[in-house]
Design a protein with these regions (language model features):
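An acidic- and aromatic-residue-enriched active-site/binding cleft used to recognize and process polar
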Residues: 137-141, 150, 158-159, 197-200, ...
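N-terminal glycine-rich phosphate-binding loop and ensuing alpha1 helix
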Residues: 22, 27-219, 230-233, 239-258, ...
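Structural beta-sheet core signal
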Residues: 134-136, 194, 223, 279, ...
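Residues at the starts of beta-strands that form the adenosine-phosphate
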Residues: 191-192, 220, 304, 416
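Conserved beta-loop-beta/alpha segment of the NTase-like Rossmann-fold superfamily
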Residues: 212-214, 218-317
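Intrinsically disordered, low-complexity regions enriched in glycine and serine
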Residues: 14-22
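Catalytic core of tubulin tyrosine ligase-like
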Residues: 269, 273-278, 286-290, 295-475
Length: 505
């Protein structure tokens, strides 16, 4: 189900493709009476969802009004199609899984300096011509981090105290400057599309406003919301969170495709002259936003989609990996939970690596044409992943299903996908769990940033002093100063920096 989209900076009258919304919510107040509206009762009964009115008699007039509006906001035909298609897909045989062909992966050790320089230059040229947009997936709250704020508002404890949003915004600012310098100082802003959710939208917008968009122009940032879908029981019936309110959940980060479509932002990108979209998740402290090298590689390969990948750290690492579905089939992501344990141990006898070693880290590049294709294709297929969860309900917590699409679902539609290996110590510092957990914490991400930046400073001729062991500290280089360690010699050579500190000039 795709609710009426609310888009900061962009408005839309769309409600998601392919469905009919039942009536107008504005008439609900006049409809709350002794019994539910006849047309609505018949409509929900047609789809086997008449349980939504089970507690009608216990509701006040105001609560009845709310329930009517809640149900009328649903595209019941679309939701019913999603539930039926998703349930039917369970247990259906899937194509045979094969490893990714070696020729589909650009490996770090195989790249020449000339290639890297050429891709960097190609990427900067495309950016300076306004061909690249950045798409941020930021619908999640920091619940596992102990915060109800959007994840991007979170600070991982760097010397600067900067939030994830600020780090990413400043990397965009730096790349804009580098692109302008490479093109006779012709400045073209990179447009930043930020997908929020109903739970994070208001807080995200206010955070950007209160921080002056971190130096970006307000009109180069567009916020839009992903949709939600009703949570359903094991037999496909809607779960009621309260007697007059449906239990809902965001439709997964793959909801970005239908959200872009219904918000008419794909058309907006086309009007801006965008051809390529750099897409990533918010919870990576080392993400190279708008990476010119990756963009240049993508353009050079001439593919519809690409993904940065890292090698699995060990066989049992709980990450999804890229695979080929079926002989000669498309590349796709196989979740760790979908892998047979024996698969995780298989070795490629030629390379000595794991056969299934290329981890998905949510760093993707798409053409705009391909995004349009995916937005229509996923909507037509209506097959969502079923995530079994404890759903808050009128009966306490009920075991049921959340219906989700994932960003990587797009790859099965791609006529051509290329994988680009990166080093996790340079580009992947996930922030998913609270400090005290064994992995992917703010502390572990902070140390990855400080260690990388310390290596940059030493390579540029700087020196470090420290009052605690260096493995537990380091220096932070402002993204406004350097994107990948470039241009630091003039700042660092011969200077001594006491860790921890931030280098800003």
């Amino acid at each position: 189900m795709k609710e009426l989209m609310v888009v900061s900076k962009v408005t839309t009258n769309g409600v998601g493709s392919g469905g009919i919304i039942i009536g107008a919510a504005t008439s609900a107040a006049s409809e709350a009476s002794v019994t539910p509206p006849q047309d609505l009762r018949e409509r929900v009964k047609d789809y086997g969802q008449d349980d939504v009115f089970a507690l009608w008699d216990e509701l006040s007039l105001e609560e009845r009004d709310f329930l009517i509006r809640d149900i009328r906001s649903l595209d019941l035909a679309r939701i019913d199609r999603i539930i039926r298609c998703s349930f039917r897909s369970q247990g259906v045989p899937t194509p045979e899984i094969e490893p990714v062909p070696e020729t589909s992966v650009s490996k770090v050790e195989e790249r020449t300096m000339d290639e890297r320089a050429r891709w960097w230059k190609m990427g900067l040229k495309a950016i300076s011509e306004g061909r690249l947009a950045v798409l941020l997936l930021s619908g999640g709250q920091g619940t596992r981090l102990g915060s109800s704020d959007p994840k991007g508002c979170f600070s991982i404890g760097l010397p600067s105290g900067k939030s994830l949003f600020q780090l990413q915004a400043e990397r965009i600012l730096r790349i804009q400057r580098l692109a302008a310098q490479s093109n006779d100082d012709t400045f073209v802003p990179i447009h930043w599309y930020i997908m929020t959710s109903p739970f994070t939208d208001d807080a995200t917008c206010k955070f950007f406003e209160s921080h002056g968009y971190f130096g970006l122009d307000a009109d180069q940032v567009t916020f839009f919301q992903q949709g939600t879908l009703p949570c359903v029981s094991k037999d496909g019936r809607f779960i009621m969170e309260t007697p007059n309110k449906l239990a809902r959940a965001p439709d997964g980060n793959g909801g970005v495709y239908s959200a872009l479509k219904s918000s008419k932002l794909l058309e907006d990108m086309a009007k801006r002259g965008v051809r390529y979209i750099d897409c990533y998740g918010v919870d990576n402290a080392l993400v190279r936003v708008a990476d010119p090298t990756f963009l240049g590689y993508f353009i050079d390969k001439g593919v519809a989609s690409a993904a940065k990948v890292v090698r699995k750290a060990y066989p049992q690492e709980k990450v999804g990996v890229f695979v080929r579905r079926g002989r000669g089939g498309p590349l796709a992501v196989l979740e760790y939970s979908e892998m047979d344990p024996s698969m995780t141990l298989e070795i490629n006898q030629t390379t000595g690596r794991l056969r299934y070693c290329w981890s998905n880290v949510c760093l993707h590049m798409f053409t705009l044409d391909f995004l349009n294709q995916v937005a229509h294709g996923l909507e037509k297929d209506s097959i969502y992943h079923l995530a079994e969860k404890k759903i808050p309900s009128v009966h306490g917590h009920t075991m049921g299903w959340k219906l989700e699409q994932f960003i990587f679902d797009a790859f099965t539609y791609s006529p051509s996908t290329a994988l680009f290996e990166v080093l996790r110590e340079e580009e992947f510092a996930p922030v998913k769990n609270a400090n005290g957990s064994t992995y992917d914490t703010p502390d572990s991400a902070r140390l990855l940033v400080l260690r990388l930046h310390s290596r940059w400073v030493v390579a540029a001729g700087g020196f470090l002093t420290h009052s605690v062991p260096l493995y537990a500290t380091g220096v932070e280089v402002s993204p406004l100063v350097s994107y990948t360690g470039e241009n630091l010699e003039a700042i660092c050579r011969g200077r001594t920096f006491h860790a921890p500190c931030e280098i800003t000039y």
